[in-house]
Design a protein with these regions (language model features):
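A short interface-forming secondary-structure element
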Residues: 45-57
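Short, non-transmembrane amphipathic alpha-helical segments
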Residues: 54-75
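N-terminal presequence-like segments and adjacent domain-start helices
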Residues: 1-13
Length: 127
C-alpha cells in the first residue's frame, strides 16, 4: 500500500500538540512524525521522562488530560505513540541528533534507526 504524504496541516497539528504538552510542563525530549514500517500510517512519536515514570496506560491518560485541557478533542488529536526514553529507537535518535543545533523540520527516511525502519519522518525535537 502507498503511504500517505505528510501535509502542512499535519505538521501544524503536530506543532500545536507539542506546544500543548510544553504548556503542561511535560518536557518532551523527542517529538516527530514517523511513518514506520510496522504501521500503515503516520504516528506522532513522543518521549518524555515524565511519561517514563508512569505505566503506559497512565502515560496515555496524562497525554489525553494535557491535550484535553488545551482544547484537543478525539477528532482533532492525531495518532500519538508514546515511547520510553530508553527505547532503542529514541536512544538512537538522541545519539545521532541531540547535538545538532536545529533539528526542527529535518526529514528522515529510508533508514533503520534503533530497532525501527523509518520510511519517512518529520522532526520537531530531539534532545
Amino acid at each position: 500500500m502507498d503511504k500517505a504524504e505528510m501535509v502542512s496541516l499535519d505538521i501544524e497539528r503536530g506543532a500545536a500538540l507539542l506546544d500543548a504538552l510544553d504548556r503542561a510542563k511535560l518536557k518532551v525530549g523527542v517529538a516527530l512524525w514517523a511513518h514506520l514500517a510496522e504501521y500503515d500510517d503516520w504516528r506522532l512519536v513522543v518521549s518524555a521522562r515524565r511519561f517514563d515514570s508512569l505505566d503506559l496506560r497512565d502515560a496515555y491518560g496524562l497525554l489525553i488530560d494535557s491535550l484535553d485541557a488545551a482544547g484537543f478533542t478525539p477528532r482533532t488529536t492525531p495518532p500519538v505513540m508514546i515511547l520510553p526514553m530508553a527505547d532503542p529507537f529514541v536512544r538512537e535518535l538522541r545519539r545521532r541528533f541531540a547535538k545538532t543545533k536545529s533539528v526542527e523540520g529535518m526529514r528522515l527516511g529510508g533508514q533503520m534507526i534503533g530497532d525501527r525502519f523509518v520510511q519517512d519522518g518529520y522532526v520537531y525535537r530531539i534532545e
